[in-house]
Amino acid sequence: MLITFEGIDGAGKSTQVAKLVAYLKQQSTPLLSLREPGGTPTAESIRSLLLDNRKSITPIAELLLFSASRAELVETLIRPALAEGKTVILDRFFDSTTAYQGHGRGISLEQLHSIIALSTGDLLPDVTFYLDLEPEEALRRAFSRSGLPLDFAAQSNESDRMEQAGIAFYHKVRNGYLTLMQQHPSRFVALDATQPPDTLHQHIIAEVETRLKLHISPLVAP
């Protein structure tokens, strides 16, 4: 089963990923937890390249580097783990590309879809948890938060990065996510990210347990 987490920077994805991983480990669920970009030596090198050049890299170059990292991750780690029956949890996947590079940066969605299909081999998540948050609240959190794991490109200073991109950019990204949610209602589970983290965690656990039962039921049916 492939589980992905999506949302704008500051929505709390990484916190919920960590909580779900801890819970599933307690349940002795075989799993693999990964982030994008990263996870393999090649992908981590690409991550470093993106971080080091986040102010100067062009949107197309950014897209292709993300896609190269994703292709490596899918083929070397994700597909083998799924074949072994593991639950794979991803902090971001290709929906981030559609929301950020497509809706946010204005790259053609038709071009994006072709590149995404190539980099993933048409691999789809079984469920995508989307943590919805207004950009203004996300920026407020970025200013108030200190010493916690940050989303991609935020390792040095998340609030500076969000200010540089601009609130308008994050509204475009959020609208992109809302569009994706409407287009794929059976895959997306929308969560109000203003709720307390533990409340969100309980909602996520309930959904994951339900979907895990449905996911394995064909294997155990008489």
Swiss-Prot record:
GO MF annotation terms: ATP binding; dTMP kinase activity
Residues that hold ATP according to the record: G7, I8, D9, G10, A11, G12, K13, S14
Catalytic activity: dTMP + ATP = dTDP + ADP
Matching Gene3D superfamilies: P-loop containing nucleotide triphosphate hydrolases (3.40.50.300)
Pfam families: Thymidylate_kin (PF02223)
Keyword check for Chaperone: no
Swiss-Prot/TrEMBL keywords: ATP-binding, Kinase, Nucleotide biosynthesis, Nucleotide-binding, Transferase
GO biological process assignments: dTDP biosynthetic process; dTTP biosynthetic process; dUDP biosynthetic process
Stored PANTHER family: THYMIDYLATE KINASE, UMP-CMP KINASE 2, MITOCHONDRIAL
Function: Phosphorylation of dTMP to form dTDP in both de novo and salvage pathways of dTTP synthesis.
Protein known as: Thymidylate kinase
Gene name per UniProt: tmk
